[in-house]
Amino acid sequence: MNLFQNAKFFTTVNHLKDLPDTPLEIAFVGRSNAGKSSAINTLTNHVRLAYVSKTPGRTQHINFFELQNGNFMVDLPGYGYAQVPEAVRAHWVNLLGDYLRHRKELIGLVLIMDARHPLKELDIRMLDFFHTTGRPVHILLSKADKLSKNEQIKTLSQVKKLLKPYSDRQNISVQLFSSLKKQGIDEANRTVGSWFDAADAAASSPEEN
C-alpha cells in the first residue's frame, strides 16, 4: 500500500500556537532547491500537492497533509536560502527549530538532499540538531537520475559511510530517489510506514509497572 497515496492538504500555519491537533506526524525538510516539493508530489502521486518552484525558499510556512491512515505528513520550510529579508529568515529558522524540537506528535524526519551535493554543512547541522530528539531520520538522495548508475552506487556508499557515526547512535537510513524516474517510492513507503507501525505498537502496548 502506498502510504502517501491520496494525501490531502489539511492546513498551513506560520506560528507554533496554530499547530493543529493530530495523531502522528512525519516531516519533510531539506535545503532550498533540494527537490523536497517534487519528492512529496511523487510520493503522493499528485502533480501539485506541494508547490514546486524554480525559486528557492518558496515554502515559507508549515504545511500539513492528511494521509489515508489518518496520520499526517508535514512539509517544512527549506533551509539555506539567504535571499530573503533577515527577519523573515530568522522567523523560518525559529519556526523550524521549535517545531522539530518540541512537537510531540512528530515521530520521524525525512531529510531531502540533492544526490549530487549530499551532506552539505547545513545538512550536517540539521542531523546534529535532530539527533537530540532521538527520533529516526530517513534521507532521500533526490535527483538521482542526474547521476549515472555507477555514480549512484558510489554516492550511496559514500553517504552511508559518512553517516556511520550517526547510525551508531540513532535510527538513520538513506536511499536514492528520483522524482523524474519514479525511483525509490516503495523503499520510502516501507521505511516511513515502519515508523507509524512502531509508534502504533508502542501506543497499544500495556505500560510497565
Curated annotation (Swiss-Prot):
GO molecular function, one term: GTP binding
SUPFAM superfamilies registered for this protein in UniProt: P-loop containing nucleoside triphosphate hydrolases (SSF52540)
CDD domains: YihA_EngB
Domain EngB-type G residue range list: 22-198
Cofactor(s), names only, from the UniProt record: Mg(2+)
Alphabetized InterPro entries for the sequence: G_ENGB_dom (IPR030393), GTP-bd (IPR006073), GTP-bd_ribosome_bio_YsxC (IPR019987), P-loop_NTPase (IPR027417)
Domain of life: Bacteria
Cross-referenced Pfam families: MMR_HSR1
Signal peptide start-end: none
A single Gene Ontology CC term: cytosol
A GO biological process held by the record: division septum assembly
Keywords annotated in UniProt: Cell cycle, Cell division, GTP-binding, Magnesium, Metal-binding, Nucleotide-binding, Septation
UniProt: Mg(2+) binding residues: 37, 59
Keyword Coiled coil carried by entry: no
Function: Necessary for normal cell division and for the maintenance of normal septation.
Family designation: Belongs to the TRAFAC class TrmE-Era-EngA-EngB-Septin-like GTPase superfamily. EngB GTPase family.
Protein name from the UniProt record: Probable GTP-binding protein EngB
Organism listed in the record: Neisseria gonorrhoeae
